[in-house]
Amino acid sequence: MSAADPSQGNKSWTVADSAALYGLDRWGEPYFTANANGHVQVKPRGDQGSCLDLVELVEELKSRNLNLPLLIRFDDILEDRLEKLHSAFEQAISKYGYAGRYQGVFPVKCNQQRHVVEQLVESGRHWHFGLEAGSKAELLIALSLVNDPEALLICNGYKDQRYIETAILARRLGRQPVVVIEQPDEVERIIRSSQELGAAPFIGVRAKLTTRSTGHWSSSVGEKAKFGLSFPDLLSTVEALRQADLLSDLRLLHFHIGSQINDIAVLKDAIQEAGQIYVELTKLGAPMGYLDVGGGLGVDYDGSRSASAASTNYSLQNYANDVVATVRECCKPHGITLPILVSESGRAIASHFSILVFDVLGTGTVPGAVPNQTGEEPLTIHNLRETLAGVMATQKGAASEISRLQEAWNDAVKFKDDALAAFRLGYISLTERALAEQLTWACAEAIMGQLPCHETIPDDLQGLRAVLAGTYYANLSIFRSAPDTWAIEQLFPLMPIHRLKEEPTQLGHFADLTCDSDGKLDRFIGNGQTKTLLELHNLRQNEAYMIGMFLAGAYQEVMGNLHNLFGSTNAVHIRMTTGGGYQIDHVVRGNTNSEVLEAMEHNPEILLERLRLASELAIQRGELKINDVRRLMDHLETSLRQTTYLQG
């Protein structure tokens, strides 16, 4: 289905038109723009540094045998996000005269990749930036990487005795772990461990807030929240710590109201409630000192700056201002020392730095040209030809013709159904059945071509856009590289990274490589609303058509799975150099077929040996020649060494 004239795009189409169409000038700020060549360009330091042509970068990486799909991580963007976060809080602290400071942590669960976590720890060292762990494995990562005695190690999640003892003993290594009590039964384990080891960790408590949240993560708050202490539990925890002479170690209050807070009003209410809890804990005798506002600092995926699920109605500076101002308002009247502010803003830090680039393998469209009549045809075929002729005879773009076009489409659907019924009963041939289908789609295309552009169109005719849309077959696995698009209908910006000087004349959606009907991308960012089709270009012979998925640096890699045994993609870490160049800091090769087979307990050597023996038997039976066997085994051995994606 054409978005414009399918044979000829708009001659006056500009790069700016493409940027507006895909929302690049909204969600891409300040890291992604389009250049005069019609390519997406990356500004890893935002408006402060030089640019990289993304298409040229991809081609150079491909020449290094780093084939698509390819995950490109810009470490400069990661650093810039960290700087912007701290700068926003520094400005807010200065603006409101807050007698305290901000000290953030990165939740390791957001992106556990070694190079990512190492980069954040090193870049955040002068802010004493720390890490948050939610499991024993993540705690091990945090303890091994953070050697700054002033940086926080927030210990969240379920905790057994060994987890707690590890955190306590880590204080003697010069680390500063804070064991956050999230379940009532953890109090006794902390007390017992402290008594046995003769030492205690810094202790925190997570409160279940009653503030109503919104969006997918609204269940993170309230009485039925998975983690946190109710108000009675908070009081009993304080009393238990007092009895064990550990109340002096209660230093932190933590809450979490969701991974993506869309509405700033929700945040204000939550901080106000948490601020009062903090005040009351100090009145009960806890020294406190830290208020951890958790995650939730959102990402404006669709660029609409709204409270929709894919956006936020606030800026980073708005967020910092409200955190600082609200906590100050809660504590000041009570003469309480203002706490050090902590956030776990993983999504806001990591989302922007990663771009997934994949190629399109081909397209599936509705049947094309209709064969001319060569002889007598069944009545259903005759009726469809007459319907098509009638549509072609209508006045193009005339509002008065809408009802006639709607009637024609209803007729076409009826005649197609008649043809299907006739085929089932054996009255028409497969060739005639196929012709009926071709004629139906020809009617649909003709009707869409005749519709006026600026009139209200009936719903059934509007639906022809989806009926005629093409399927673009993507060289990736949604379940591996973008699982949230399937699991929670997360929206990520998607667009071609080249050909932006050309008007996209097709509408389509993407289907991935998996043998699963859910393996598709069919929800896209529109102008303030979600759309089911994306404007795309016709494919060209012997020319790659490359698509970029943006803002997907948080959660996607670790949550991806091996559906159909499609593994991780190739990944590179890019850093800008002086003079506008770049260097590749790290190359992380994607899973090979051999590796994913081994992950499922298959031994590649045994598999090859079985096939070799089967080939030898086939030679003996005269079913295969030696040259054929050599080619077969060569293909198999090469495939085991290659990544799991298609390579032409």
UniProtKB/Swiss-Prot annotation:
Substrates-to-products reaction catalysed:
L-arginine + H(+) = agmatine + CO2
Q: Which Gene3D superfamilies match?
A: 1.20.58.930, Alanine racemase, Lyase, Ornithine Decarboxylase, Chain A, domain 1
PROSITE patterns, per the entry: ODR_DC_2_1, ODR_DC_2_2
Q: What EC number(s) would the UniProt record show?
A: 4.1.1.19
In this record, what's one Pfam family? Answer: Arg_decarbox_C
The chain residues annotated with the modification N6-(pyridoxal phosphate)lysine are 109
Its needed co-factors are:
Mg(2+); pyridoxal 5'-phosphate
InterPro entries, from UniProt?
Ala_racemase/Decarboxylase_C, Arg_decarb_HB, Arg_decarbox_C, Arg_decrbxlase, De-COase2_CS, De-COase2_N, De-COase2_pyr-phos_BS, Orn/DAP/Arg_de-COase
Q: Which domain of life is it from?
A: Bacteria
Q: Binding residues for substrate, per the UniProt record? A: 291-301
Going by the UniProt record, its keywords in alphabetical order are: Decarboxylase, Lyase, Magnesium, Metal-binding, Polyamine biosynthesis, Pyridoxal phosphate, Spermidine biosynthesis
GO terms (molecular function) for this protein are: arginine decarboxylase activity; metal ion binding
Check the record and name the HAMAP family matching this protein.
Answer: SpeA
What is the documented function of this protein? Answer: Catalyzes the biosynthesis of agmatine from arginine.
Q: Which family does it belong to?
A: Belongs to the Orn/Lys/Arg decarboxylase class-II family. SpeA subfamily.
Q: What is this protein called?
A: Biosynthetic arginine decarboxylase
Q: Which species is the source of this protein?
A: Prochlorococcus marinus (strain MIT 9303)
